[in-house]
Amino acid sequence: VRAAALAKLGAAGAKVLYDVGAGTGSVSVELSLMAGQADVYAIECEEKAVELIGKNRERFGCGNLHVVFGKAPQALDSLPAPDAVFIGGTKGNLPEILSILFEKNPSVRIVVTAILLETALQACESLEAFTSKPAEIMQLQVSRSKKAGKGHMLCANNPIFLISAGGCADE
C-alpha cells in the first residue's frame, strides 16, 4: 500500500513534501530517503507517535525530515508551500486541510488514504473542488495465505482506497 501511495504521489523533483497524519513516520522516512535534498515534514498530533517518528528519523539518518507536533490544519500554517502531500489521517478535518494546502500551492499533488467509503467519497469531492482534473480513486485489496488442512486459503484484509489529484504525477 505504501509503495502504491508513494508512486501515485510522484514526488520526484519535489522540494517540499508533507506527510499529514504521519503516525509512526514510515511514509515520512521513505519520502525522506527517496527525496534526497527535499524537505519532508511529518505532521502528527499524537505525542507518542511523534516520539517514534523522531526515533525513526535518527535510526534511518533522515536529516531532511522535520517532525511537526500538532493537529492539521493549524499545524500547517507556518510550513513552506508543499509540492506533494501524503494524507494518512485527518481527524475529520480533510476539507479544511485541503483548503490550506491548495491555498499554499494551487498545483500541489495530493494522495489520501481511506478505509471508509465515506472518507474516500469526501476526499474525491473535496479534491475535485480544488482541481480541474477529476480525482482518481484506486482500491487496493491484500490477501494473505493461511494454512487450511492440507492446503492454503487466502484471507482478505480490509480494502484501502488511494485517492489522488492535482499536480502532474504520471498517470
Predicted regions, residues:
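S-adenosyl-L-methionine
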Residues: 43-82
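Conserved class I S-adenosyl-L-methionine
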Residues: 14-23
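Core SAM-dependent methyltransferase catalytic element
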Residues: 150-171
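Conserved SAM-binding loop of SAM-dependent methyltransferases across substrates and taxa
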Residues: 24-36
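C-terminal substrate-binding/active-site "lid" region of AdoMet-derived donor-dependent transferases
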Residues: 98-156
